[in-house]
Amino acid sequence: MNELIKHKLELLPDSPGCYLHKDKEGTIIYVGKAKNLKKRVRSYFRGSHDTKTELLVSEIVDFEYIVTESDTEALLLEINLIQKNMPKYNIKLKDDKSYPFLKITNESFPRLVITRYIKKNDGLYFGPYPDSYTANEVKKLLDRIFPFKKCKNPINKVCFYYHLGQCCAHTICHTDKAYWDRLIDDVKHFLNGKDDKIIEDLRSKMLAASEEMAFERAAEYRDLISGIATMRTKQRVMSKDLQDRDIFGYYVDKGWMCVQVFFVRQGKLIQRDVNLFPYYNDAEEDFLTYMGQFYQDKQHFIPKEVFIPEAIDEELVAAIVPTKIIKPKRGEKKQLVALATKNARVSLQQKFDLLEKDIKKTSGAIENLGQLLRIDKPVRIEAFDNSNIQGTSPVAAMVVFVDGKPSKKDYRKFKIKTVVGPDDYASMREVLFRRYSRVKKEGLQAPNLIIVDGGVGQVNVAKDVIEKQLGLTIPVAGLQKNDKHQTHDLLFGNPLEVVSLPRRSEEFFLLHRIQDEVHRFAVTFHRQVRRKNSFSSTLDHISGLGPKRKQLLLRHFKTITAIASATSEEIQALGIPKTVVEAIQQQITDNKNDRSSP
């Protein structure tokens, strides 16, 4: 804990509010809320914590706080701050969590379409459905039963679907509004499970077709009836009142939380949502934060009712979710929440079981690798790779694997300082010397194994630096790739030789992951440096454009091409004066003309 934090801790008020933890770059890494800011924020820097909280605390170099009038206001503010800043230690909902809906458009001739986006007053929506396959299957069934218009734009002749009896062909079909109202009502009844009348009608048509010896048509009606029956069986009835509701349950263990949501539509369970994440505060508070984020996503349909567990404050939920909040006390409804909670517990236990299995596999892999190389178990492995294009913007990267898993906080990037031109050996020599002279000088943790991406030459360079120049006794290995740029050979020993490694062994998969990861990290860093260099060279020597403004442009636009495409107003919106904007645009134009001239 630094002096700044010590001083700020003394000034914290006994009030509700939000706090924002920051790292050494000033980036917000965690947002939390508290009924008492003084107690909550101080708790991070006192006493012992579990591993994940220790990791969070180790990165905190500053914090801010915002006082609110109430706990409810703090919760709302927390949700907004998380959405705005996306701190890396906060709950992150899974990407692409929008579900498909069926929609009847409100056009003059309505169409039945599938969409993942809900727009107010834009039509009738049914769903959500668990996935696009299910939504498409239901739509196919509806298309065969109800003749909605299929064509988006007006045409002057009937379409293919009209001949199949699946389109009204608006050029000749009913323009009577009452007709469409009846059709839409029929769809509503059908999707609400009131399909007996439709089945009876289809059965009558099937029998009539059979009597007329029109067996193909009769078979079509039979298949439609079968499709409706199949759709019925796929939906489990969870309540008899046919209400739309979301049912929440959660379970916590070992510093992790699992939230389970059952989506119930017209009394039927159509889908569940599962999310697992580490939590850092009180479980009930983090659950509330999750709910707030969940419904702040505009693609999440808000049902008429939401069931929540007994431990959760109804008033706080009501403040963030604009619908009826129910905390069931008894009977079937309470059992539904219990079922969601039970499923959350099972999902969390499955995660722990899989983690344990993975740990055993990984532990076995590094143990076997150590035995294969006749070295101590390589608990910590550091791997290196260079990246450049014809010697331009040369960089290198180091990734660290601890207990067989990436330790990203230990990753390091290196800009090559002493090498001119494309010389991978000299670049590797520089990077390894810089890294391990510092390890030796500062007493940093040394790895059990160093891996370089390359063949005999790279390994010999690495051994020369480690053993001869620095006098260290750290084993060095090399990973060679084949013509397809895939991990192929492990080089080790004195003299160097290819180590026989079964291609389907866990040890091989571990080395493959390490090589891929260090290559990815090096290439990503090289792209960043190259882009920044290109960016800087173009924008150098522009009066009024200093390092801070250049950094601002880089963060916002990413590339020179993006700046060239931007309007003056868009660039000025970043706080850059009009005269400087004009100079930037002129410089980009001049550079473009220079490149195009002979």
Swiss-Prot record:
Domain UVR: 196-231
Gene Ontology MF terms: DNA binding; excinuclease ABC activity
UniProt subcellular location: Cytoplasm
Domain (GIY-YIG): residue spans on this chain: 14-91
Main location: cytoplasm
UniProt xrefs under InterPro entries: GIY-YIG_endonuc (IPR000305), GIY-YIG_endonuc_sf (IPR035901), GIY-YIG_UvrC_Cho (IPR047296), RuvA_2-like (IPR010994), UVR_dom (IPR001943), UVR_dom_sf (IPR036876), UvrABC_protein_C (IPR050066), UvrC (IPR004791)
GO cellular component: cytoplasm; excinuclease repair complex
Alphabetized UniProt keyword annotations: Cytoplasm, DNA damage, DNA excision, DNA repair, Excision nuclease, SOS response
Biological process per Gene Ontology, one example term: nucleotide-excision repair
Pfam families: GIY-YIG, HHH_5, UVR, UvrC_RNaseH, UvrC_RNaseH_dom
Alphabetized NCBIfam families for the sequence: uvrC
Described function: The UvrABC repair system catalyzes the recognition and processing of DNA lesions. UvrC both incises the 5' and 3' sides of the lesion. The N-terminal half is responsible for the 3' incision and the C-terminal half is responsible for the 5' incision.
Quaternary structure note: Interacts with UvrB in an incision complex.
Similarity section: Belongs to the UvrC family.
Protein name: UvrABC system protein C
Protein species of origin: Streptococcus pyogenes serotype M6 (strain ATCC BAA-946 / MGAS10394)
